[in-house]
Swiss-Prot record:
PANTHER family found in the cross-reference section: DNA REPAIR PROTEIN RADC (PTHR30471), UPF0758 PROTEIN YEES-RELATED (PTHR30471:SF3)
Listed name of the protein: UPF0758 protein SAG1101
Biological processes per GO annotation: proteolysis
Phylogenetic lineage: Bacteria, Bacillati, Bacillota, Bacilli, Lactobacillales
CDD domains: MPN_DUF2466
Domain of life: Bacteria
NCBIfam families xrefs: PRK00024.1, radc
Span of domain MPN: 103-225
Protein family: Belongs to the UPF0758 family.
Positions with a binding annotation for Zn(2+): 174, 176, 187
InterPro entries listed in its UniProt record: MPN, RadC_JAB, UPF0758, UPF0758_CS, UPF0758_N
Chain ranges passing through the membrane: none
Amino acid sequence: MYHIELKKEALLPRERLVDLGADRLSNQELLAILLRTGIKEKPVLEISTQILENISSLADFGQLSLQELQSIKGIGQVKSVEIKAMLELAKRIHKAEYDRKEQILSSEQLARKMMLELGDKKQEHLVAIYMDTQNRIIEQRTIFIGTVRRSVAEPREILHYACKNMATSLIIIHNHPSGSPKPSESDLSFTKKIKRSCDHLGIVCLDHIIVGKNKYYSFREEADIL
């Protein structure tokens, strides 16, 4: 049986969410907000508690049918449909989060993806890929867009988003509008600079990839500096 811990004090879920944040509310409080109202002889928190008491764990909540929900006094067709819609949306959000976190297995894999995105760009784009402990992408962020003559980005800007995303590793990618991925001296200098900054914060700089027209250069594959 799913364990419910009821509080003695009067609960005002909406006000508590505003004051404390959604993560501080109990499961029955969150469900009560979705249900909105109870019935004359049963407050909404009592209804939400009864729903949760009908399942062995929160993971089973999504398995409740419309008929099972409607068998609970205070839950009619409208509320049961709203609950099922909320559960389906939550499932789709979870799937979208998982799909977004593509796992990077090699520099070549990422380079091929980025050649499609940046290979034909007329301006230089500097992109950072932030990853978790399993090399799954947390965020892909364009740090800078500039001309061939001016494409400077400070490591602190790159690392700001690494810290914000709680990333454990990152890969830097930029394109050469000329189509040739051959690194320049400034590319080499920047790579060393970003690696030093990452090391200082305990973030792993896995690679710096330069993409051109159907070609790429990986500092990890070609140079002994990462």
